[in-house]
Every structure is written in structure tokens, then in C-alpha cells.
């Protein structure tokens, strides 16, 4: 294999490489054996056409494309490795020569990893806005939240207040004409919940069951239904019932209803205090890690971040997001319809985040390289076992999904993050 690389501009160049006849000939033989099985040529049994007759009738060149498709991926990977390149985006491949009896010549326009000039990344001073201490108010807030979850709705005679639930019928119209989606019957609406467009719920406060209220609202300018956006509407709303939350007493019985593992309210408070302390400690560690890494990134200089890297990160993030939705039974079309957004909107949403994440990844990789971090076979095996446990998979499944190089990369990245974080101090 002959390999050369020519820099064209920052982080871009042309990689030229060859595929030798030593590789081409056996691949052409393999392709021919596969192709001849389906050939019907007069005078020969199906699948028994001799190679010289094939070459005479169709030309050896008829096999070239399939052979190239098979040989190119490994040849490109080998060329990148031999040239010592770190390619960060899909290449633009061009087959420049496929002459009979000659080595094939291919060029690839590639984008390479940008240079990272590291600044300080160890012994950093950082600020975090996360409290580690658990207060009585924290514990009481969590218990109150659980207490409210056990509340029952009880019909009340008095006028509706914020926090109450009303059961209503409503008919919406614009300039006296009803519109699609503007009607509902026996709808339970929590006042103050923000379920309906701004102003709707507020106008029901102070009214009682049996009353009919003309609710006048204006649809937001960015409302998903474009034909309604920015328009004033009237909703004739009849209140059937007003219900108030009735929360259970704050006692030992409540504690047992919330958590069957405790016997008293004091037990529940102690348990919640420990859980909140663990959660706050984890949040504090995450905040320190985030602040330290952000500082290391700010201290570094990246020489011209290629747009292709950002685009690939956006694409990866969007696919990951949509994949998570599909696992929940929501397909992309359904999501875009519900949210009134498009694929382009989603890409734009991830754009800024992708640029930041790409810079962060580059700096952490540069730290790992500068520190000479590596991963032993023992560490790789331990990582595989941990991933298998985390995702409830067999070890063999993880090994099939992730290559040793991918696992080694992840381990070295973790070591770099640990170095940046563990040496940081909080102001």
C-alpha cells in the first residue's frame, strides 16, 4: 500500500492511498464466485460459467465495483493509521484510478482532529453553587410533597381558589365562530397548574359550582396552532364542581403510608435525611466536576474547531434523543406533531450544546494524551463487567457491542476527568 497525505488548510487535507493487486485479485475471484451463481449464459449451466468466458463476455471491470466496496473500508482505515491521522468526520472518497492490472488509487478529503493547546488543568480553583448540608426544611419539603401526593380531592361549596380543581365544560370561539379543539366536557382543571393558556385559570378563581363564566384570553404568538396564534378567544365555561385538596394528618400513620419500611414519622425523617444527604453529596461532586472541566476547557485553546465535528455531535445527540423517545413508544413524527416543532428545530436546539460538548471532549482527550493515560487488560475487563451489570446484559453482549479500543478510550477519559476533578479545590 502506498500512502501520502497533503495538508490543504487547517485541519483539512487529502489522503491518497492505493489498493494493491495482491489484494485486488483474490477479491475479484471472490466476487466472481458470488456473481456467477445467478448468471444465466446460453451454453453453460447456471453457476458454472468459466472465468475467462465471463471476462470475455462482460469484462473483468464488471466485478470492480463490488470488489472496491469490499476492500475500501479496511484500506481506508489502514491508510489513516499509516499516515498517523486522527480523522473526526466522514471522508469524501474519490476513486481516481481503477485500471486493469494496476493498483487502484483512491483519494479521501478528510477533516482531522484540531490541535489543542492545554492551559492549566490541574490544581484548579472553582466555585460551585450547590449546598451539601441537609436542613430540616429540606426534609419537611420532601415529606410535604409525599403528603400532597396522598391528598384526596373533596367537593367544596365555597368559591374556587388557586390550588383547587374545577370540573368544567367549555366552548371556545373567535369572533363568534367555534374552532377545532376548543370544546371540552367534564374536564378536570387544576387552577394554577398552567395546563391552559395564560389567563384562563385565573379567571375561574372566585367562582363557584353552577356558575357560567365568559373567559376571555389571547393565544400566545408562538402557539403551535398557527391559525389561533395571537388571536383573542372567548370560552363560555360552566363550572360543575369545585374540589379542594384534603391532605392527611402529619403523623406516624402518614409515615407508614408513605414508606412501609418505617414505623414512625421520626423514622421517616431520619431516612429522608440520609437519602437527601447522599443525593446532595452526589450533586456537589457533579458540580465540582462540571466546574473543574469547564475551567480546564476555558484555559485551553483549540485551533479552529471544524464545523463537521459539531454537525456530527448534533446528529448523534438528535439520534440519541429520538431513540430514547421511540423506546418510550413515541415515534419522531408523533413528537414533532405534539410539540409543533420540526427536525430542523431539534437540530438547532442541540447546536450550541454540541459545540460546547465537542470542545470539552477534545480537551479531556488532550489531557489523557498529555498524561500518557492507558488502560490495562484488567481495567478493560472490569469496565466490561461494570457495564454488563449497569445495563443488565451478558458480558459477551457488551464485548460484542464495544471494541477494546472504544473501552480503552472510555477508561482513559475517565482517568483524565478524575485527575482534573480530584486536584481541584472549591473556593
Curated annotation (Swiss-Prot):
Domain PPIase FKBP-type as annotated: residue spans: 163-248
Documented EC number(s): 5.2.1.8
Gene Ontology, cellular component aspect: cytoplasm
Gene3D superfamilies: 3.10.50.40, Trigger factor ribosome-binding domain, Trigger factor, C-terminal domain
Reaction equations catalysed: [protein]-peptidylproline (omega=180) = [protein]-peptidylproline (omega=0)
GO biological process: 'de novo' cotranslational protein folding; cell division; chaperone-mediated protein folding; protein transport; protein unfolding
SUPFAM superfamilies assigned: FKBP-like (SSF54534), Triger factor/SurA peptide-binding domain-like (SSF109998), Trigger factor ribosome-binding domain (SSF102735)
Alphabetic keyword roster: Cell cycle, Cell division, Chaperone, Cytoplasm, Isomerase, Rotamase
Top-level lineage group: Bacteria
Keyword Isomerase: yes
Location relative to the cell: Cytoplasm
GO MF annotations in UniProt: peptidyl-prolyl cis-trans isomerase activity; protein folding chaperone; ribosome binding
NCBIfam families associated with the record: tig
Domain text: Consists of 3 domains; the N-terminus binds the ribosome, the middle domain has PPIase activity, while the C-terminus has intrinsic chaperone activity on its own.
Role description: Involved in protein export. Acts as a chaperone by maintaining the newly synthesized protein in an open conformation. Functions as a peptidyl-prolyl cis-trans isomerase.
Family from the record: Belongs to the FKBP-type PPIase family. Tig subfamily.
Name the record gives this protein: Trigger factor
Species: Streptococcus pneumoniae serotype 4 (strain ATCC BAA-334 / TIGR4)
Gene: tig
Amino acid at each position: 500500500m502506498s500512502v501520502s497525505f497533503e495538508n490543504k488548510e487547517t485541519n483539512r487535507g487529502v489522503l491518497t492511498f492505493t489498493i494493491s493487486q495482491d489484494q485486488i485479485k483474490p477479491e475479484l475471484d471472490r466476487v466472481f464466485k458470488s456473481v456467477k451463481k445467478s448468471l444465466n449464459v446460453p451454453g453453460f449451466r447456471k453457476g458454472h460459467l468459466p472465468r475467462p468466458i465471463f471476462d470475455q463476455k462482460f469484462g473483468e471491470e464488471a466485478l470492480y465495483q463490488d470488489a472496491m466496496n469490499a476492500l475500501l473500508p479496511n484500506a481506508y482505515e489502514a491508510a489513516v493509521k499509516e499516515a498517523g491521522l486522527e480523522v473526526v468526520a466522514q471522508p469524501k472518497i474519490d476513486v481516481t484510478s481503477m485500471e486493469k492490472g494496476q493498483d487502484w488509487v483512491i483519494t479521501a478529503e478528510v477533516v482531522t482532529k484540531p490541535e489543542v493547546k492545554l492551559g492549566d488543568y490541574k490544581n484548579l480553583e472553582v466555585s460551585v453553587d450547590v449546598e451539601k448540608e441537609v436542613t430540616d426544611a429540606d426534609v419537611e419539603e420532601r415529606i410535604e410533597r409525599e403528603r400532597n401526593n396522598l391528598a384526596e380531592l373533596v367537593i367544596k361549596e365555597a368559591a374556587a381558589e388557586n390550588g383547587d380543581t374545577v370540573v368544567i365544560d367549555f366552548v371556545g370561539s373567535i369572533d363568534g365562530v367555534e374552532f377545532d379543539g376548543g370544546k371540552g366536557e367534564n374536564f378536570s382543571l387544576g387552577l394554577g397548574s398552567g395546563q391552559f393558556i395564560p389567563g384562563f385559570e385565573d379567571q375561574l378563581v372566585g367562582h363557584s359550582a353552577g356558575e357560567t363564566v365568559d373567559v376571555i384570553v389571547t393565544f400566545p404568538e408562538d402557539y403551535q396552532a398557527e391559525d389561533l396564534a395571537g388571536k383573542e378567544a372567548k370560552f363560555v365555561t360552566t363550572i360543575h364542581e369545585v374540589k379542594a385538596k384534603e391532605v392527611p394528618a402529619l403523623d406516624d400513620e402518614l409515615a407508614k403510608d408513605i414508606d412501609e419500611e418505617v414505623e414512625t414519622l421520626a423514622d421517616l425523617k431520619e431516612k429522608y435525611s440520609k437519602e437527601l444527604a447522599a443525593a446532595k453529596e452526589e450533586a456537589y461532586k457533579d458540580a465540582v466536576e462540571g466546574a473543574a472541566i469547564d475551567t480546564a476547557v476555558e484555559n485551553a485553546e483549540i485551533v479552529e474547531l471544524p464545523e463537521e465535528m459539531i454537525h456530527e455531535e448534533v446528529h448523534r445527540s438528535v439520534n440519541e434523543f429520538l431513540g430514547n423517545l421511540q423506546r418510550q413508544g413515541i415515534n419522531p413524527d408523533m413528537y414533532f406533531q405534539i410539540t409543533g416543532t420540526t427536525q430542523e428545530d431539534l437540530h438547532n436546539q442541540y447546536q450550541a450544546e454540541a459545540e460546547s460538548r465537542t470542545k470539552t471532549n477534545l480537551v479531556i482527550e488532550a489531557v489523557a494524551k498529555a498524561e500518557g493515560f492507558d488502560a490495562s487488560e484488567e481495567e478493560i475487563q472490569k469496565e466490561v463487567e461494570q457495564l454488563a451489570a449497569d445495563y443488565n446484559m451478558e458480558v459477551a453482549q457488551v464485548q460484542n457491542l464495544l471494541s477494546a479500543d472504544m473501552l480503552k478510550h472510555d477508561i482513559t477519559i475517565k482517568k483524565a476527568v478524575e485527575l482534573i476533578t480530584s486536584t481541584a479545590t472549591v473556593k
